[in-house]
Amino acid sequence: MDSPEKLEKNNLVGTNKSRLGVCGWILFFLSFLLMLVTFPISVWMCLKIIKEYERAVVFRLGRIQADKAKGPGLILVLPCIDVFVKVDLRTVTCNIPPQEILTRDSVTTQVDGVVYYRIYSAVSAVANVNDVHQATFLLAQTTLRNVLGTQTLSQILSGREEIAHSIQTLLDDATELWGIRVARVEIKDVRIPVQLQRSMAAEAEATREARAKVLAAEGEMNASKSLKSASMVLAESPVALQLRYLQTLTTVATEKNSTIVFPLPMNILEGIGGISYGNNKKVTAKA
């Protein structure tokens, strides 16, 4: 932001405090006399209506009258010596066309945006710049390119609000001398090459697949831990094994299947288990 001394030096408003002088007063009285002589016709030429959202900057013999804008309402403009300029104080929408930008990581992209601003000082907007709207438009383009050129592509895609706020601050500071207040800056669209879009899509797909595989592996590991815990509980409690057997029979009986399953009774299973256990002991003894 410029220092107060620099702003005062570049500010053309109020730098000339000299009065009209003798010739100026003579012309003033002649103009006033002309208005009185042509009175009722001069009313239509000298009285101007300024709307609520407008202000009028009146130049009398080339100097801004009273160093401030007039309006709203009726204002008096003297013939031949007064010239006035209307200034609209409503918010202006400035669309920034797509700008070719080379990011910090050497990626070419096109970015467009929109700037909302309004004139808060009509005198500064008229006296300090030739065309305030054109100047603001060109400054918004260059500021957008300069700010985005210092960012990487990922920063532009993920940090639009921060970048827009930075652009707004720079524009607001630069246009203060012109009587402009920047209300908001928005980045509308970021266009990247098609080849880069495909690369980013492939990278995102690979990341999703890797994440899905990790989740599946974690699920299998948790399931195996649960099965191990359940098998240990059933091994320690024969009653629990019998209850599980009965639950399985109930489930099979309630399902409408074309295949009929005849489960073996528990005593037969226990007998088979006992025979197998005895054979294992004999083999161990012979060994």
UniProtKB/Swiss-Prot annotation:
InterPro entries: Band-7_stomatin-like, Band_7, Band_7/SPFH_dom_sf, Band_7/stomatin-like_CS, Stomatin_HflK_fam
Pfam families for the chain: Band_7
Chief localisation class: membrane
Cellular compartment(s): Cell membrane
Knocked-out gene: effects: In deficient mice 35% of skin mechanoreceptors do not respond to mechanical stimuli. In addition, mechanosensitive ion channels find in many sensory neurons do not function. Tactile-driven behaviors are also impaired in mutant mice, including touch-evoked pain caused by neuropathic injury.
Entry GO terms, CC: cilium; membrane raft; neuron projection; plasma membrane
Gene Ontology BP, a term: signal transduction
Membrane topology: Single-pass type III membrane protein
Positions of post-translational Phosphoserine modification: S3, S237
Tissue: Expressed by all dorsal root ganglion neurons and is selectively expressed in neuronal tissues. Detected in olfactory epithelium.
Alphabetized UniProt keyword annotations: Cell membrane, Membrane, Phosphoprotein, Signal-anchor, Transmembrane, Transmembrane helix
Residues annotated as transmembrane: 25-45
The protein's assembly and partners: Homodimer. Interacts with PIEZO1 and PIEZO2.
Purpose: Required for the function of many mechanoreceptors. Modulate mechanotransduction channels and acid-sensing ion channels (ASIC) proteins. Potentiates PIEZO1 and PIEZO2 function by increasing their sensitivity to mechanical stimulations.
PANTHER family: BAND 7 PROTEIN-RELATED, STOMATIN-LIKE PROTEIN 3
Family statement drawn from the similarity comment of this UniProt entry: Belongs to the band 7/mec-2 family.
Protein name (database record): Stomatin-like protein 3
Organism: Mus musculus
